Amino acid sequence: FKGTPKFSSVFIQLNGVYKETNWDEEFKASREVGIDTWIIQYAEGFNDRTNEKSSFYSPTNLPWVTKQYDIMNRMFDAAERNGMKLIVGLYPGDYSKEDTTKPEQYEFLVERNKQVFDELFALWGNHPSLAGWYITEEFHDGSYPVGWQQEPALSMLANYLQTVAAYVKSKSPKEVCIAPALWRGMPADLCGKWFGKIFAQTPDIDVLYLQDIGGRCLVDFDVD
């Protein structure tokens, strides 16, 4: 590889197929193309709608987990050997698809994220390869199927993000990251103003990653 790297980090969405992966090989290949950071999207499987709930790290004492893998354990071991950095996603939750102004779902997600973070911090909070934390729930500035364009939903979303981020920062000095979807049919200036309102209420959020949906239209209305 002789060119200039255009990306220095990648996301990975873990599942059981990675249980035998050779992470030394994967991380060495990443370093060869200028990638020195992997973002683990979820510490658990995004499978709330099934009876099985998988954890990608071990051990865990969380009562809802039914199956444990040691995938992240092996990733951290290999990351240290290969000079790789890892940003760790927390609980794989989701927002309400019907009403974003009800507090119950936010409260549920706060508690789940705290519990997952506490276990992850106990395992790797002082690990040399830990580069940060990732709040997994993806939101957007549109209105499909529901959104947060108006109050009180906007501030409820911001309060949720800040609550989780502040809890993380109370124990760990590492950066807290999010990756929402940008500009789902909204004009760019309105998108910027909307995110400005979110960030004004979330001082403990450090990094916004541009999701692959950035700039996409055809969600709230068609554009020729």
Which residue stretches match the model-derived regions?
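Glycan-processing catalytic domains of CAZymes
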Residues: 1-224
